[in-house]
Amino acid sequence: MSWLRTSPLRQSLTRNSGGNGSGGSGNSGNASATVRQRPIDAATDCDPRACYDSFCKHWQQAHEIIQHAGPPTHDDVLGVVSHLDYMVTLLLVELHHCNKVSLPTADAAPPTAPCLEYLLSENLLDKLYEWASTTGRYANAVRLEQLKLYELLVSHSRHQLLCHEPFLRPLLKILASSQGEIFPPDLEKRLVILLNQLCVVLMQNVHLLDLFFFSAQTQVQEQIQNGSLAAPKSGTTTNFIIFSLLIPYVHREGSLGHQARDALLLCMALSQKNSNIGHYIAQYSSICPLLVTGLGGLYSRLPNSIEVSAIDWHRITPDDVAEIPELTLFMNALEFCNAVVQVAHEMIKQQLLDFMYQGFIVPVLGPAILQTLKGKHFQTNIDSQISAMSYLDLILRSITEPGLMRAFVKFLLDTEKFDGERILDALVERLHSPDANLCMVTMALFDTLLGLHCEDLMLELLLKYMLPGKHVPISHRHKINKIDPYLNTTEFFLELTPDVMKRARDLARPKSVHELVDPGAALSSTMLPSLPSPVMSKTIGANWNYYGHYTGDSLYANIQAYLFEAHSRIAQCQRDCGKWANNYRYQKWPRQGQVRATSHALELARQFFSEFGTATPVAVAAVASSELGEKQLDSLQSIGESSGYESFKWRPDDADANDATTTTATSDPDVEHNNSSNHNNSSINSSGRRDLWRVSHSARNEILLTDLDFSEDLFAQGTVNLGPFLNAIWGKLQTFTSNSLYVNLHLTGLITRLAWYPLPLIHSLLLRSDIAITSDTPSFHQVLRMLKQQIDAELPVAENSLEIIDVARSSLIDREFRLINARKVSDNSPLHQQHHQQQQLQHTTNSTHQQQQAQQRSTYATLSAATPMHATPTSAYDPFRRSDNKRRSISASISNIFGRKSTSSTAAANPNPASSGLSQIYAFFTGAASTLVGGINGEVNSRGVAQENPRGNTCETSLSTTPRLDAQATSASSTNSSIGGSTQTLSATHSSSTLHGVESGPQTASFNSEPVSMDSVASMGIIANTSGTERSRDLALCAVLLDEWLKELAAIALEQSVVLVTEQLL
């Protein structure tokens, strides 16, 4: 927002030629008939005396016309306007001359402005206003010239003239007379420009604010007494006239609305510096209800169904906002509300937040998301649900103020406004949707919610189901905070790689290096089925030199890239989670407080045994002896740090527990406790409601987690529920091999985001393979094992499988490079730069990071480390052979490939079909031109129409960097991605990683049209392969994606162990 920008000044003025306008009105009218251009040059030297004489002469002639008896005629008005136009020109020349004078010295007098002094001394502005009020139907024309004159004087003289009564008084008169009037567009534009300039001057000279505010009040009172202005309906004469005149233009389109909103924001900022302004806006203006009702009206105009052509579309991008006019207006209003909350007085801020929640969020967004009308659910199609959730996701990514964010978090968790139904629960239910588009939009929304790092949301989604610790067996709970198993988990994830991926990696590695680096793998590879030694090709990525990239810049199989990404994401998450009110991690008794902790455990043991009425002197004696330092074995292996039985159960709020907690906290200052929260309720709904959606450090405390909670049955059997959110995620993961590629990318990205949280509780589910889970669903690691077994069974290590794996990897690398270059093109577009300024840039793309690292680290220069070579047993392709001297574009290469009439004619015309990387991919297939069919695995699309005819929609989702690009407009959104999809933001600024797809308009079935992307073709299984079925091709994509995701999880586990070590050292 350009809050302090000044209005653009006139660079040239249209002036009248002909007569001087002397005499009567007839001559004046003839003089204004001929028009000539008369540009004003600031460097033009002029005689100040001649300018002054000419200025006085024009005013005398205009004054003669004003003094005429009777109502003004058309010629009279034209004459006065003509003379006033010349006076404005002379004033502009004089002011330019005054402004360009060098810096004054101590004894130098300020430059004189005789024309301006004459204007003020003769009270010309007041006389002109009084005459303009009698012009009748010509009032707007005269008012326009007056506004031009005031605009000129304010813009050049800054604040000096506001202190002069001959200038301020007529200015307030003309502003007061403009209230409640409907003006033509040109007059509205001049009025808003003048008001904007006045706000800028007042912002820079706050000491004039009280004078202007109370002068406006006095002026209104005088006009009411004179009868020229009706008394306000509110019964008060208090009026900040600049603000009141700007309110009607707050929802206007175009530059007029932008300037009005900028001026209103300046008034809001002034309210923090002057309590009178804040009190007036909050008590006597209607700006807050007007903003909220306007926002609701603009939301109702949004399309009920968003037309998308890409099968991987999952969220609204800045390009979509620019292409939908209704959405553009809505986002302007939302950003303005966000800015008002940021800069306004506390009274205004609180009033706007209350109106937003009660007037827009609950009554408008709630029914739209829940698809309800008057409390009853109504039948809707998938498209309306997708659009409503996309709008909510866009809103959450656009707002930045904690107050607004807190209102939306409360909205998601509120159970009173929607008859006991929570918005968050409804969103979780949609994760089970069989519709791929709705599922992707829902996962993108949850990715945004998890990216907020909000304690209340995490508590409701995961932590409240994990805090009791019952998902971990008692015998395993002592392992939660251990660091060594994280390194073992890294090996565990790498071992889960499908066998076909291991075999492909072994074949791609040179034998000498293979035996030198991993001699153990050579032994294990002998256990695999023997295959004929294929003719190995170089990495396909290295062949695509027309991208202008070296293959080592690819993120495929680049463990350094995953480590870099994991480190930055975990660090950011750790900073945000450090502001939480509670520390959700397993907490053992500190060593320095071991004596006090053991005494507390002894008291708990006595209470426990007293409930059964059984004396246990052995156990009590054992604990007592441990206080004296004696090492004895407890008869009941539940007390003591070394027993290994720990619980996450929160401390009960009874008097004894509170007394014990107080005693412990008093004796040990290093351990902080919190007994005011209840883990079953979100803090947004609890009695101790916090004001911030992400709690500050001042409110930080830690939850006391004891070594043992005796309220838990030690011999209880059965499983526990991890909550609907994790159950839905695990359910989707179990159908990994049946999901589409884009659903799997979002799914892996969502789980990856959870793994970034520096919480050992979450790590016990995701990153700790040595901890057993007693949930009612298969654990995360069990699901991964099942996926490996399924892929190994259905995609055995064979020559055909290796070919399909090679094609799958090649197509993903192909898409990565194309999208990197598409993003570079879009970064230079004006649309991208505009949205880049509107939001915070949270993170650059992974590919850009790695390209910079490639220039600094020698490890990235190693070809085999960055992108392993691919096994292509049937290809004799040499990647270093070139038949042309120029680098070609991707679109031309694809068009040349698919523009051939037949495979046989192609082979005959080009005996060396491996002139590009895509040619090698194309050589793997036969009959591709005749076997293109639409749809995903024969299913219907999201619109309910069967995809029988081929469409040329280029739909892509990259493993590394996947901005959404319009193939014809060549513009992409500023988003970032990592393997499996990572964070999402706008930001502009803000931003965040998404899995956008490249889309183009509908095309014909001819290959002369826009081609289908290799990745979308492969993911839909519509390329016929001589040696593979559609199911095998889908499994190949799943295997490649799973392999890369396991590497990313291994990198996260490694970085999380570093974080834990650092915390202990600090």
From Swiss-Prot:
Residue spans of biased composition, Low complexity class: 658-687, 836-856, 967-996
Domain of life of the source: Eukaryota
Modified residues (Phosphoserine): 512, 829
Listed Polar residues bias regions: 1-15, 950-963, 1001-1010
Bias (Gly residues) ranges: 18-27
Residue ranges, annotated region (Disordered): 1-33, 647-688, 827-885, 942-1010
Keywords: Phosphoprotein
Family stated for the protein in its record: Belongs to the FHIP family.
Name of the protein this chain belongs to: FHIP family protein GH13096
